[in-house]
UniProtKB/Swiss-Prot annotation:
Domain of life (superkingdom): Eukaryota
Name of the protein: ATP synthase peripheral stalk subunit OSCP, mitochondrial
Organism expressing this protein natively: Rattus norvegicus (Rat)
Boundaries of the annotated transit peptide in chain numbering: 1-23
PTM info: In response to mitochondrial stress, the precursor protein is ubiquitinated by the SIFI complex in the cytoplasm before mitochondrial import, leading to its degradation. Within the SIFI complex, UBR4 initiates ubiquitin chain that are further elongated or branched by KCMF1.
Motif SIFI-degron: chain residues: 5-23
Length: 213
C-alpha cells in the first residue's frame, strides 16, 4: 500500500511544483534536505520562491498561516475532517485573498486543501523554516543545563560555541533548563551531540561498577 501512496504524493508535489515554477526551466535545490511529505512540499516551495526572489516574503506568509491556524475559528473551518474539501478550498481562498498572500503561498495552501493535506500544513511550515535557517547560514544549537546560566557564563559559552563555526555561519542558540540532568550540560550543535551532564557521568560510573562485579 505504501507504493501507491508515495506515487500519489509525488504527483501532488509535481502538480504544485509545476503550477508555481512553470515560468522557469530549472528547480533550485535547497541547502539542506528535508524529508517526508512536508519536506517535499517545502522543497518545491523553496525552489519556486527562490526563482522568484520571494523567499523572505513566503517565509513571513507561512508564519502568518501558522498563526491563523491556531485561531479556533479558522482551524475549525479548514482542519475539521467532517467538512467537505470543496468548502475548505473556498474558505482558504477567502483567507489568502484577505491576507493578500503571494500566489506562491496561495497556491500551496490551495493544493494542500485539494489534496486533503491540510493536516500537514504545520509540518510544511516547519520544514520550510529549517531550509530558510540553513539558507541564512544559521547553525542550530541547543544547550541544556540543570540550572539557568548567568550572563557571564552564557557569554563565555557563546564565545566557545562560535569558535566551532565556519566563516559566514551564524549561531542560533537555544538554552534550556532540565533539573533531571543534575548538573553539567548537554550540547547539540548542528549534527554534533555532546553529553557532559552529571546524570550521564553517574550512569557511566554505575555501568562501569556493574561491569567490574
Amino acid at each position: 500500500m505504501a507504493a501507491p501512496a508515495t506515487s500519489v504524493l509525488s504527483r501532488q508535489v509535481r502538480s504544485f511544483s509545476t503550477s508555481v515554477v512553470r515560468p522557469f526551466s530549472k528547480l533550485v535545490r535547497p541547502p539542506v534536505q528535508v524529508y517526508g511529505i512536508e519536506g517535499r512540499y517545502a522543497t518545491a516551495l523553496y525552489s519556486a520562491a527562490s526563482k522568484q526572489k520571494r523567499l523572505d516574503q513566503v517565509e513571513k506568509e507561512l508564519l502568518r498561516v501558522g498563526q491563523l491556524l491556531k485561531d479556533p475559528k479558522v482551524s475549525l473551518a479548514v482542519l475539521n475532517p467532517y467538512i467537505k474539501r470543496s468548502i475548505k478550498v473556498k474558505s482558504l481562498k477567502d483567507i489568502t485573498t484577505k491576507e493578500k498572500f503571494s500566489p506562491l503561498t496561495a497556491n500551496l495552501m490551495n493544493l494542500l486543501a485539494e489534496n486533503g493535506r491540510l493536516g500537514n500544513t504545520q509540518g510544511v511550515i516547519s520544514a520550510f523554516s529549517t531550509i530558510m535557517s540553513v539558507h541564512r547560514g544559521e547553525v542550530p544549537c541547543t544547550v541544556t543545563t540543570a540550572f539557568p546560566l548567568d550572563e557571564a557564563v552564557l557569554s563565555e559559552l557563546k564565545t566557545v560555541l562560535n569558535s566551532f563555526l565556519s566563516k559566514g555561519q551564524i549561531l542560533n542558540l537555544e538554552v534550556k533548563t532540565d533539573p533531571s540532568i543534575m548538573g553539567g550540560m548537554i550540547v547539540r550543535i548542528g549534527e554534533k551531540y555532546v553529553d557532559m551532564s552529571a546524570k550521564s557521568k553517574i550512569q557511566k560510573l554505575s555501568k562501569a561498577m556493574r561491569d567490574l562485579l
